[in-house]
């Protein structure tokens, strides 16, 4: 730990991590590797061809359990290489090799094993294979002391391979007579035994004869009982299709040709005959040539060779393929019928428990009932507007409950047009919104995080849903916007424009101005927004229009009871202590708890606390304090040996590095170590250890800066800059660590929160105040003065005074609140108590901020609301004159007499009567002469005309 990496070492690490192992020569490396592999295989095959298989294989020092032997001391396919005939018999003629090349092709009905020469038929098909019994008639020609030589059939080379001979004279002296004169004996080839032991066992008298040959008068073969006996077989077993051995029968007790001796591990000598050229016999026979081939066998008598069993193999395979196709077709029909009948139903095991046990009624909700009733009361306040019902009068308990008095309104809608549910994830906010919407009679339109939440979505979907009535459904629509705090800010701004349009439409409708009311849309349907963080900057402009309901997680006892009910319905044995541990792991997240129980129930119907502990995430399996204690604790040799006894590959350094790497925030771990190591006892008079620590901290900062620049491959070196605390300051005794100060992290969080509050307050000021004060002046001077003014201290007599005789300090506080757009919002604090909180909370920006009592803030809130309503009405009257004034102006304007003009605009003079002339003269003799103004209407018509035109200016028209 004395050598500390510098900047040069950091650059070397970065270059080493960014270099590709092969570089540009990757293809050459790959070609060279393939060449070496081919060369090695060629050398291995060459060595195999030049050795003597029987001598090298059976007279070797390999044990019986070696992979080059099987269980019966007989060479396996791995030893003999069934596809390589040259390794078995080296004296095969050249003509025989040519015959092998021109062997008949494999039938298309059989499995294709030509791609892999070493794969036999038993590895290529998996069907129900019954045992095969052969009834052999007229067996007098076959002596009892004959030798049976098994030859394995190779489908790739279309040839048979030598197997193990069975000497019935020596091996089966005590067994029953296999062939006898004057009766039909049965040769039984069992499927399993033929695959494992390559043995032939005599069949009992009561056994099933699968295939029999009996000579009739004409010398033909009677094979009509094949299908009947195959269908009557009830002893079929599910085994792999074995290779069918072929029997070669030679007269006499010794082989007629040359033979090869082999000695087993037990000392027994086995003789193998040399392979003969039998490729011209035609090993693969077509089914239509079966009868002719069998008749030839009966005529020859003693030449009962391999073609017999090969024919049996072909017949049995054909029959099994047909039977398998029929069974598969029958199963397919059954599955299709089941899918047709159950196409609309979903298996219960495939459904999520979260959907199965989702509350459907209001009484099934889990959590605080007061929060549920407040949300239900808000959505029922829309009934006069949506359903045309009369507004419900609040009960006596609701009249004095601040939770419900803020919701009700004098109009047919609540004061807050949208409701915002806020709380932790998994607490049940979305379920509550759906339940109260369905309970109130609405059809839900949900917009969640997976949808396109843009301004276009608001204008197309939301605006049409909340303004019109759907023609496809008789139910009105309630819009639920889930996770609105994580959406696009443009979506929030578009939703805010709908609320502002509704506010203006409501103002003009109350003022009686129907023309301007048509320009703005009225909000006619409820909107429910769901968020996790209420104080996200994107939700700042939306908070004043929302009825905020704080949703807290349900009590742990209620949550454990609901989980116990679910486990009882699903037949799962679990105790309450385990369920309590599960709720602690997921912080009362009911959705995660139910999903975890369903996951654990897949493998076991009994769940204990040890099983639930496995669900604990790796990052939460240990706290930061336990990690700090492990870093500063030095284990002795006895403890390390005890751990290594149970874990042979254990390394204490690797374990600490893994825990540091598994921590969520490496910066917080390093900061905790930095605040802790100075309080630990260590002897260092020269302060060399703190100097080394500062160097490692500098290296940590360099790594972080490189990672933030995009060099993420250096991230895995960060734990090495923290592990030095263990080498320098670890002690054998477990010291009691003090709580480290978290001033840096707490200050960072508080700075972000309070900066958001200050920005929201400055955004409400006008341009003159922003230019006059500035951000620093507002924070240090203006905010404290405002807080002192809006929190007046009233005496007991002044507090009980009537509203009409308010003191001047109350009036001044109301004016300040109205000028700076401040308000008091009522919030629950638990146990049925409420407080009035200043919005935005400027008191958090000032140390020892002044406060006032609940009654004073309640009075200020009510008087502020009255003042703002009065200002709105006054502004409406000034902007929109009354209908009487407008009608009077229109009447005076139309009282003027029209003047007659000709086509060119010249005035046509009319003779005036004497009475009119005298009256006009009388009016003109007054102090104020009367000037008659003529009405001029100008209208532009777009287009072209060939009529008589005259160039004229607008000034000439006005001065006519």
From Swiss-Prot:
Keywords, in A-Z order: ATP-binding, Cell cycle, DNA replication, DNA-binding, Nucleotide-binding, Nucleus
Ranges of Polar residues composition bias in the record: 58-69
Binding site for ATP: 423-430
A Pfam match: AAA
GO BP annotations, alphabetical order: DNA-templated DNA replication maintenance of fidelity
Keyword Nucleus annotated: yes
Domain of life: Eukaryota
Predominant place of localization: nucleus
Compartment(s): Nucleus
GO cellular component: chromatin; Ctf18 RFC-like complex; cytosol; nuclear replication fork; nucleus
UniProt similarity note: Belongs to the activator 1 small subunits family. CTF18 subfamily.
Subunit details: Component of the ctf18-RFC complex which consists of ctf18, ctf8, dcc1, rfc2, rfc3, rfc4 and rfc5.
Protein name as it appears in the record: Chromosome transmission fidelity protein 18
The species this protein was found in: Schizosaccharomyces pombe (strain 972 / ATCC 24843) (Fission yeast)
């Amino acid at each position: 730990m004395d050598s500390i990496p510098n900047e040069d070492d950091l650059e070397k690490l970065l270059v080493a991590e960014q270099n590709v192992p092969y570089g540009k020569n990757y293809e050459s490396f790959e070609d060279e590797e393939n060449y070496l592999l081919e060369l090695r295989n060629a050398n291995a095959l060459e060595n195999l061809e030049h050795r003597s298989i029987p001598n090298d294989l059976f007279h070797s020092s390999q044990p019986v359990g070696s992979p080059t032997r099987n269980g019966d001391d007989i060479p396996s396919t791995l030893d003999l290489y069934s596809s390589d005939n040259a390794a078995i018999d080296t004296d095969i003629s050249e003509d025989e090799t040519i015959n092998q090349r021109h062997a008949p092709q494999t039938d298309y009905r059989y499995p294709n094993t030509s791609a892999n020469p070493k794969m036999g038929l038993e590895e290529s098909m998996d069907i129900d294979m019954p045992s095969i019994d052969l009834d052999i008639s007229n067996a007098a020609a076959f002596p009892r002391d004959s030798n049976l030589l098994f030859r394995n059939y190779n489908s790739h080379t279309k040839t048979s391979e030598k197997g193990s001979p069975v000497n019935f004279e020596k091996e089966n002296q005590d067994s029953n007579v296999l062939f006898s004169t004057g009766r039909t004996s049965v040769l039984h080839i069992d499927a399993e035994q033929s695959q494992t032991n390559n043995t032939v066992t005599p069949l009992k008298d009561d056994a099933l004869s699968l295939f029999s040959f009996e000579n009739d008068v004409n010398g033909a073969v009677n094979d009509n009982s094949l299908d009947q006996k195959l269908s009557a077989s009830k002893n079929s077993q599910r085994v792999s299709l074995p290779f069918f051995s072929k029997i070669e029968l030679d007269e006499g007790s010794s082989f007629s040709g040359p033979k090869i001796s082999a000695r087993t591990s037990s000392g027994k000598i086995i003789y193998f005959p040399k392979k003969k050229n039998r490729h011209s016999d035609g090993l693969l026979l077509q089914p239509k040539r079966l009868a002719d081939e069998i008749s030839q066998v009966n005529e020859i008598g003693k030449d009962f060779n391999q073609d017999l069993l090969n024919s049996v193999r072909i017949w049995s395979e054909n029959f099994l393929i047909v039977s398998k196709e029929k069974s598969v077709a029958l199963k397919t029909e059954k599955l299709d019928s089941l899918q047709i009948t159950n196409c609309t139903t979903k298996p219960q095991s495939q459904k999520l428990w979260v959907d199965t046990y989702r509350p459907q009624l209001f009484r099934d909700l889990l959590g605080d009932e007061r929060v549920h009733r407040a949300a239900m009361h808000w959505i029922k306040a829309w009934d006069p507007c949506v359903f045309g019902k009369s507004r419900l009068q609040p009960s006596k308990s609701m009249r004095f409950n601040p939770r419900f008095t803020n919701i009700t309104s004098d109009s047919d809608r609540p004061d807050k047009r949208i409701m915002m549910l806020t709380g932790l994830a998994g607490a049940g906010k979305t379920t509550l919104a759906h339940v109260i919407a369905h309970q109130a009679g609405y059809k839900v339109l949900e917009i969640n995080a997976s949808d396109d939440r843009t301004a276009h979505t608001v204008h197309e979907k939301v605006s049409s849903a909340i303004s019109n009535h759907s023609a496809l459904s008789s139910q009105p629509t309630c819009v639920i916007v889930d996770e609105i705090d994580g959406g696009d800010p443009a979506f929030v701004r578009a939703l805010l424009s709908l609320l502002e349009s509704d506010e203006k439409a409501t103002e003009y409708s109350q003022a009686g101005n129907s023309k301007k009311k048509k320009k703005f849309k009225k909000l006619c349907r409820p909107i429910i927004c769901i968020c996790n963080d209420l104080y996200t900057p994107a939700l700042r402009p939306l908070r004043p229009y929302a009825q905020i309901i704080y949703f807290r997680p349900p009590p742990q006892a209620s949550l454990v009871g609901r989980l116990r009910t679910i486990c009882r319905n699903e037949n799962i044995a679990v105790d309450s202590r385990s369920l309590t541990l599960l709720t602690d792991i997921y912080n009362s997240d009911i959705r995660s708890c139910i999903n975890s129980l369903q996951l654990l129930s897949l493998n076991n119907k009994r769940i204990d606390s040890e099983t639930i502990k496995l669900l604990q995430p790796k990052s939460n399996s240990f706290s930061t304090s336990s990690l700090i204690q492990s870093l500063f604790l030095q284990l002795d040799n006895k403890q390390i040996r005890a751990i290594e006894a149970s874990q042979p590959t254990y390394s204490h350094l690797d374990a600490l590095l893994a825990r540091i790497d598994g921590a969520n925030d490496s910066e917080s771990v390093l900061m905790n170590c930095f605040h802790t190591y100075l309080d630990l006892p260590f002897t260092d008079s020269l302060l060399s250890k703190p100097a080394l620590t500062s160097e490692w901290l500098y290296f940590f900062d360099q790594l972080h800066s490189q990672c933030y620049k995009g060099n993420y491959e250096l991230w895995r070196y960060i734990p090495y800059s923290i592990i030095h605390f263990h080498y320098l300051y670890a002690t054998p005794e477990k010291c009691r660590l003090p709580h480290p100060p978290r001033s840096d992290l707490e200050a960072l969080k508080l700075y972000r929160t309070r900066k958001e509050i200050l920005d929201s307050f400055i955004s409400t000021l006008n341009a003159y105040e922003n230019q006059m004060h500035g951000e620093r002046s507002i924070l240090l001077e203006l905010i404290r003065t405002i807080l002192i003014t809006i929190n007046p201290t009233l005496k007991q007599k002044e507090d009980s005074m009537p509203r009409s005789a308010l003191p001047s300090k109350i009036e001044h506080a109301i004016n300040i609140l109205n000028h700076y757009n401040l308000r008091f919002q009522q919030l629950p604090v638990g146990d049925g108590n409420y407080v009035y909180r200043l919005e935005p909370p400027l008191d958090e920006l000032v140390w020892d901020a002044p406060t006032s009592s609940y009654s004073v803030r309640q009075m200020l809130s009510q008087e502020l609301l009255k003042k703002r309503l009065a200002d709105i009405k006054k502004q409406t009257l000034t902007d929109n004159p009354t209908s009487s004034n407008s009608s009077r102006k229109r009447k005076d304007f139309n009282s003027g007499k029209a003047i007659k003009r000709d086509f060119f605009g010249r005035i046509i003079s009319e003779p005036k009567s004497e009475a009119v002339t005298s009256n006009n003269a009388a009016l003109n003799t007054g102090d104020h002469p009367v000037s008659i103004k003529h009405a001029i209407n100008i209208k532009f018509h777009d287009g072209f005309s060939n009529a008589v035109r005259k160039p004229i200016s607008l000034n000439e028209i006005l001065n006519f």
